[in-house]
Amino acid sequence: LFKLAASVQVRTLPEISNVPFCFVPGIRFETGGPDNTDMLRGEEAEVFGALDSEDDGKQLFIHFGSHNKIIYVENGSITQAATTLSGELLWAVCNHTILKSSVPRPGTIEWKMDVASVQQGFRTAEQYGLSRALFCARVHQKMHGLTQQQILSQVLGALTYADWQMFRHLFELEYKKVTLYGRQVFTDAFLF
């Protein structure tokens, strides 16, 4: 935290305001080859804001948004992170694929996760991969009359499996607490 605070750049932008602006540079992780690099660009501020000043233990934070991230904190320092594109992928799948007519439009209905459908999407992605799991959601709608909520739940289950594949190595570490925050559709699906 102190290292991050020391790297904050303070600027005055008189054309906007006389109040100083603090720019937080983010955090980079380069722990090996290109597959082991990652970065945080704002989530570190959320994590440090959520940390209990008395807690020096090991924790996981899972941020769900346009990019889903798992962040490992040890003794008040962010030591590892992994990021996926699942939030953007959900938007793309729901707006620019054959599934767009199969899922509810954002804001048109209240989100109600169908646990069995999330589990189905998760299992299908685990067995056949993400692309097939997404297509199977469409097949299930056409052949079995699943509702838009059930189809969206299957899509979220498939994306949750893809995230789990990326995140599970951090769950193998020692930790005392897990904090999930962000988009409700992802937190709901992750907790199934």
Regions found by a protein language model. Name each.
Residues I98-S101, R105-F192:
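ATP-binding/phosphotransfer module of carbohydrate and carboxylate kinases, centering on a glycine-rich
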Residues N18, D56-Q59, Y175-K177:
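A general structural motif
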Residues L1-T37, N75:
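Short beta-strand-loop/turn "lid" adjacent to the catalytic site in phosphate-handling enzymes
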Residues G26-L60, F64, K69-T124:
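Glycine-rich phosphate-binding loop plus the immediately following alpha-helix
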Residues L1, F64-H67, T179-Q184:
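Glycine-rich beta-strand-to-loop/alpha-helix junction loops that act as flexible
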Residues R11-T12, G49-L51, R168-H169:
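Short, flexible, glycine/charge-rich loop motifs used to bind or transfer phosphoryl groups or to couple energy/partner
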